[in-house]
Structures are given as C-alpha cells and as structure tokens.
Amino acid sequence: RLGFSGHGFNDFRPEDQEVWCMRPEDVPKYQAEVRALAEKYKDKIEILCGVEQDACSTSTTEGFDYVIGSVHYVEKNGMYYCVDESPEVLEQGIREGFGGDVYALTKRFFEIEAEVVSRTNATFIGHFDLVTKFNEGSRYFDPMDKRYRMAALSAMDALLETGRPFEINTGGMYRGLRTEPYPSLQLLRDLKERRGKILLSSDSHDGASLGFRFAEVAQAAKEIGFGSVLVLKKDGWEEFKLL
C-alpha cells in the first residue's frame, strides 16, 4: 500500500537495566517469527530481520540481517544516563552526572557515538544526534555552539572512516518532539560536505509512522546536495537517485 519493495523489522537488543528491550530468551522467537514472515510474503515484499544495538550493550548480534548502531546512554563514573527517555531523566543526567554542564554531557554522548560502529559492528548509524530529542527550540543547549559542534563533527569524522551510512530518521518528527529529522539539517549539510552516504528511516513503533514525511526529508536532502539514498537489500546496499 505504501509502495515499499522491502521492510526491515528491528527490536532493541537485551539490556539488563531496561524493560523495553527484548528479553534474551525472546530473541530466537523474534528471529523465527520474522523469518516466517519473510518466507510467507517473499513473492510480495522482501523482509529483513534486524536489531538495534546500543553502544553500551555487550549482547551478541549474531543471526540478524542488519544492525543499527545507536547511542541512548552516556556513561560517567560507572553510571548510565539515558538521553531520550524523558526531559526529566535528561535533566537528572546533566545535573548528577555532569555537574549541570550540558555541553559536558553532549561531548560524552558524541565520544560514545564516535565508537558506535566499533562497539556494535553496525550496518548503519542510527539517529546520530539523538541527544537533541528534547532540545527543540534550544531548550537545553545551542546546537550551533562550538562546544556542541566540535564534538558532533569529531564523531561524524570518526564514523565516516568506517564507511557506514547515516540514517535520516523521522521518528522524532512523527512523535511531535522535533521539527527536523535526525541528524539535523545543519549536520546533514556537514555530512554532505564530507561525502557521507544516507538512507531513510521512520524509526516506526507503529504502522501509521511507516515512511513518515519521507518525501519531505528526501527533498531536503536533495536541496542540501545529496544525489542519492541507499536502500538495504538482502544482498547488500543499493543506491537510488533522488528525483
């Protein structure tokens, strides 16, 4: 109905401290169910079985078609602070973990982000600047401040060396938290200047969000200068021109 030739399912890899991740014993069942769907609908649509692996996770990623590498936590002195659970939890992390210095938190976030591929063996990089989830209108920090920019661009440069593409993620827009995708339009300009590759992702947690505002963000990417987007297939990446 939406015109997709393929679809990727991905759940969060098990984490001891979080109830919203898969339980370890559920992973084989999840993989089997997605494989069954792939077989059932193979003549209509290609279905891949993926996983979103946080940089702090130590779980294996074996048995998946692809891995999304992401950062949801910043670690400081043995404590883990979630950046995307709620504004209150973010504020707690800024206060308790970083002495009220939000730029120290964003710097640590991007230090971990820089290692997300080496930590997760990611197929692609998910929501690169997730730390901005609750920062609409510069609520907590200025994304053009040099302290933020230097940390973000350092991470971007490190990840570009891995050759992995960056997703343009519309999930925050769908949830009404952001007016721009992840990465922000400014960071997408930086990515284009560095000849990075992109793909589109709606980070869907429900059917209604599938492909959310793809046409709009694809047009924005084209205006920035991107000529194509990548699409992940069973046999690897395919590149499609932005029209």
Locate predicted features.
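Short N-terminal signal/transit or membrane-insertion segments
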Residues: 1-16, 57-60, 64, 121-137, ...
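A metal-dependent hydrolase metal-coordination microenvironment
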Residues: 1-88, 99, 103-107, 209
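Structural preference for beta-strand elements that scaffold enzyme active sites
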Residues: 1-3, 46-48, 65-68, 123-125, ...
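Divalent metal-binding pocket/active-site signature
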Residues: 4, 9, 69-157, 165-175
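A structural signal for well-ordered alpha-helical scaffolds and beta->alpha junctions
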Residues: 27, 31, 106-110, 152, ...
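A generic local structural motif
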Residues: 55-56, 111-112, 185
